[in-house]
Amino acid sequence: MPGLIDCHCHVLQSTSNLAALSVESANYAAARAFEIMRGMLSRGFTTIRDVGGADFGIAKAVEEGLVEGPRVIYGGKALTATGGHGDYRSKGQYYEDPSYHVPRISRLCDGVDALRLAVRDEVRKGAHHIKIMANGG
């Protein structure tokens, strides 16, 4: 019997409290993601398309059989502008480095050059697609 495909998920987003996720260890977040993925597989999902957060490490762990889970098609970090849908910083958080990464699922990139660089970087890291979070959502 063919498996199901989840076309929009964020396996690193183990809670809707994104502020709490931003202070978690990346290793802990990955462990939680693997737990989520085992559950997805047990519900019949054999492929998932992660649209922000998962990367080559998550996909490789499944491919090599290190963890049990569905095949992962990933977009790496979702791209967002300052104040966009993927800018999860609190009002008191600032940054000066234009390559600043918003924790876990998105990445800030303001302007054409920064967006071009971010796309190229995510593709370099193996992203199968690119998600752009252009405005509030």
Q: Which residue ranges define each predicted feature?
A:
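Metal-associated gating/positioning segment near the N- to mid-region
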Residues: 1-64, 82-89
